[in-house]
């Protein structure tokens, strides 16, 4: 037992006395041997913290950049707000050469006020207002049914569309009114002679209606109506020429009558105004 204990004690004393192999050296070795995993752990942890810190730094830099952009935008807005915003007004040369614009003691507010007054008295602005008023009056007058120009345009279009008919405009209205009954009769009868085109009121030299002429006088053109067909049959060239001359005379008389009516309506309008 003593022999077994003595070597342990001797070994322990020798280990304590030997420099570099004592418990201190053993502790240092253990600490050095235990140091690398700790260091490795710290290095790993340091790498993670470094990545996190880099992420935080990038976010912070982005925030700084955004804040700088916002601040620069606010600064630009403040500069624009401080600078006076004057409205551009186009003035004539004679207005710009006026003496009150060249006065050296005028402030910006006074110049702006003078420019607004000059805009009111500008010729282009007045022309635009006059043109707008004129267009408004024209539109308002064209909507009225009794306007002379509108009535004349309707009459001229009606004459241009119905020149081949040997009758006046008021007779076309009768034909339109009787067109429904004539269409119904055309279904039963294959051919039917239109009676409205074969009679015409007689006019004397003064253009006054005296009565109705006979049917033999107006037989220059015969208009037959068939289902889905409308054609004209000429009787003789002499009769057609006489009818054309008569139609021209009637048109001239009607135009003179319309001109006299327009003059009378203008006089009544002037009296009312």
From Swiss-Prot:
Region (Disordered): 1-47
Pfam families per record: FAM216B (PF15107)
Entry superkingdom: Eukaryota
Protein family: Belongs to the FAM216 family.
Annotated protein name in UniProt: Protein FAM216A
Organism: Homo sapiens (Human)
Lineage: Eukaryota, Metazoa, Chordata, Craniata, Vertebrata
């Amino acid at each position: 037992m003593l022999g077994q204990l003595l070597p342990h004690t001797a070994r322990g004393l020798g280990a304590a006395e030997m420099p570099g192999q004592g418990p201190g050296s053993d502790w240092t070795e253990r600490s050095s041997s235990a140091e690398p995993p700790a260091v490795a752990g710290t290095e790993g942890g340091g790498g993670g913290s470094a990545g996190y810190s880099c992420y935080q730094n990038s976010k912070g830099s982005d925030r700084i950049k955004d804040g700088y952009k916002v601040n620069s935008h606010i600064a630009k807005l403040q500069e624009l707000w401080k600078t006076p915003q004057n409205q551009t007004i186009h003035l004539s040369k004679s207005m710009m050469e006026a003496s009150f614009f060249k006065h050296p003691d005028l402030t910006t507010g006074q110049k702006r006020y003078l420019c607004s007054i000059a805009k009111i008295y500008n010729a282009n602005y007045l022309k635009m207002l006059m043109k707008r008023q004129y267009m408004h009056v024209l539109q308002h007058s064209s909507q009225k049914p009794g306007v002379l120009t509108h009535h004349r345009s309707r009459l001229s279009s009606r004459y241009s569309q119905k020149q081949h008919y040997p009758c006046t405009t008021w007779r076309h209205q009768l034909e339109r009114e009787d067109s429904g009954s004539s269409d119904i009769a055309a279904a039963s009868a294959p051919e039917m002679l239109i009676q409205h085109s074969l009679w015409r009121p007689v006019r004397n030299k003064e253009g006054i209606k005296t009565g109705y002429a006979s049917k033999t006088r107006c037989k220059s053109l015969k208009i037959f109506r068939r289902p889905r067909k409308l054609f004209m049959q000429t009787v003789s060239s002499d009769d057609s020429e006489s009818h054309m001359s008569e139609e021209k005379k009637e048109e001239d008389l009607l135009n003179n009558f319309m001109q006299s009516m327009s003059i009378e309506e203008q006089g009544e309008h002037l009296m009312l105004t």
